[in-house]
Swiss-Prot record:
Entry's Gene Ontology cellular component terms: cytosol
Catalytic activity: [molybdopterin-synthase sulfur-carrier protein]-C-terminal Gly-Gly + ATP + H(+) = [molybdopterin-synthase sulfur-carrier protein]-C-terminal Gly-Gly-AMP + diphosphate; [molybdopterin-synthase sulfur-carrier protein]-C-terminal Gly-Gly-AMP + S-sulfanyl-L-cysteinyl-[cysteine desulfurase] + AH2 = [molybdopterin-synthase sulfur-carrier protein]-C-terminal-Gly-aminoethanethioate + L-cysteinyl-[cysteine desulfurase] + A + AMP + 2 H(+)
Gene: uba4
EC number: 2.7.7.80, 2.8.1.11
UniProt key word Hydrolase: no
HAMAP family assigned: MOCS3_Uba4
Main localisation: cytoplasm
Organism encoding this protein: Neosartorya fischeri (strain ATCC 1020 / DSM 3700 / CBS 544.65 / FGSC A1164 / JCM 1740 / NRRL 181 / WB 181) (Aspergillus fischerianus)
Protein name in UniProt: Adenylyltransferase and sulfurtransferase uba4
Cofactor note: Binds 1 zinc ion per subunit.
């Protein structure tokens, strides 16, 4: 027994000594890599002597005369200088997403003198984009955003199979997209190809920014920067993801984040190799209406069990190429919680035929029968609304439905206090039509209102207006504001 304990103690001592030796070797490797990076940076330095750099007796310069004029005020910044400007000119930056983030990022990177900019975006320009996507103009509505932003690039859709072939030709990647599945794909590809990634997002009045996979160490090297999966191992619930179209966005907010992305890209391009311990990864949070508007949260290092950057990674270039990694399945698809039967839905055109005197037409009036409930939030209801419609936000309806579900199953459900008197009346059987912006929330609201007993056990019709106010504009009122 005593011999076994001595053996165990000896093994522990050997392990500790080996780990200490390994830590020392890692430190030596980091110093060597830093020195190699410095030598490489020195190798790119361009020195022109009095006798050199002359053609036919005329002195030549590393930049064109126009470039000195254009970038002069940038080059006198110590962190950039001539060598930084030369690095920018030789850099290749890929921007995925030519929207609210990608437009200002591309604008400022091009203005800074980045030699090659690549854009990937499959969307077309819409009028609703113009207040924040500063590369697009009214004349380009309907064109692909890539064609609008930079004429010589063709439209491209990013898929797992083609992402590596697109990314490999660039030095740094900017994620300017707005959906989780694409974000995970971009991050995975950047890690597997050893590319730094500048990722940003913006919604309403807030934004976030991260520099990921920086320094871009090999898969399994814990000294490398974390990836998107390290920060968010699990994607958000699909139904919780809110787009700018649904949640809204202030142009200057997304512009701020795009400009910051461009700034971080310039820093990565012009700076020497980063020391992970000296520059820990962080998440920058911007809130336009907070004081102060900026704050920083330190991020953890690479996760030991990360699916893409750990030693036991399950996501590889091979899995991307064969398409075995299903990013849409991984992130989930937001499904409609309560799809109604055809009998519970009515088109705007059919509603006008069924109630010709009640439905407003071209500035006409509407009586209180039938009742139209608009379930958009108040800020949207105030933008435009059907005359005499009642605003009951979907959030209010869902909150009441949740309380009803937690009540005694044997008790008679009580109607909520926010219901208008005519709807809460026990004698009222007037039909209720629910409308929202696109026809999705209205279906959920109909289900909840029936759970609350508004249909009087089937005696009162409760249904939704199919297609929402967008369909109303298409079928009834072409002058209806589209936002």
């Amino acid at each position: 027994m005593e011999n076994l304990e001595q053996t165990c103690a000896s093994l522990r001592a050997q392990i500790a000594a080996t780990e200490a030796q390994l830590a020392g070797l890692k430190r030596e490797l980091e110093i060597a890599e830093q020195a190699a990076a410095d030598v490489k940076a020195q190798d790119t330095t361009i020195t022109i002597t009095a006798d050199e750099g002359r053609i036919n007796g005329t002195r030549t310069w590393p930049l064109l005369s126009e470039e000195y004029k254009r970038y002069g005020r940038q080059m006198i910044v110590p962190q950039v200088g001539l060598q930084g400007q030369l690095k920018l000119r030789s850099a290749r930056v890929l921007i995925v997403g030519a929207g609210g983030l990608g437009c200002p990022a591309a604008l400022y990177l091009a203005g800074a003198g980045v030699g090659t900019l690549g854009l990937v975006d499959g969307d077309t320009v819409e009028n609703s984009n113009l207040h924040r996507q500063v590369l697009h103009r009214s004349k380009n509505v309907g064109k692909f955003k890539v064609d609008s932003a930079i004429e010589y690039l063709r439209e491209a859709h990013l898929t797992p199979q083609e992402a590596p072939s697109i990314f490999k030709d660039y030095d740094i990647i900017l994620d300017c997209t707005d959906n989780p599945a694409t974000r995970y794909l971009i991050s995975d590809t950047a890690v597997l190809l050893g590319k730094p990634l500048v990722s940003a997002s913006a919604l309403r009045t807030e934004g976030q920014l991260m520099v990921l996979n920086y320094p871009p160490r090999p898969v399994g090297d814990k000294s490398g920067g974390p990836c998107y999966r390290c920060v968010f191992p699990k994607p958000p619930p699909a139904n919780s993801v809110v787009s700018c179209a649904d949640g809204g966005i202030l142009g200057p907010v997304v512009g701020t984040m795009g400009v910051l992305q461009a700034l971080e890209a310039i820093k990565v391009i012009t700076s020497p190799a980063v020391n992970p311990s000296a520059s820990p990864p962080s998440l920058l949070i911007f809130s336009a209406y907070s004081t102060p508007p900026f704050r920083t949260i330190r991020l953890r290092a690479r996760r030991a069990n990360c699916a893409v950057c750990s030693a036991d990674a399950s996501v590889t270039l091979e899995t991307l190429k064969i398409g075995s990694t299903d990013y849409v399945f991984f992130c989930g698809v937001a499904g409609l919680e309560a799809t109604l039967s055809p009998e519970e839905r009515i088109s705007p055109l059919e509603l006008r035929k069924r109630h010709p005197k009640e439905v407003p037409q071209d500035g006409g009036s509407i009586s209180k029968e039938p009742t139209i409930i608009d379930v958009r939030e108040k800020v949207q209801f105030d933008i435009c609304n059907l005359e005499h419609s009642v605003n009951i936000p979907i959030s209010t309806i869902l909150s009441s439905a949740s309380n009803a579900a937690n009540a005694d199953a044997n008790a008679q459900p009580s109607l909520p206090s926010w219901l208008p008197r005519e709807l809460a009346s026990a004698d009222s059987t007037n039909p209720i039509y629910v409308v929202c912006r696109h026809g999705n929330d209205s279906q959920i609201a109909v289900r909840r209102l029936k759970e609350l007993g508004l249909d009087r056990g089937g005696q009162r019709y409760v249904g939704d207006i199919q297609g929402g106010l967008r369909a109303w504009r298409e079928q009834i009122d072409p002058d209806w504001p589209e936002y």
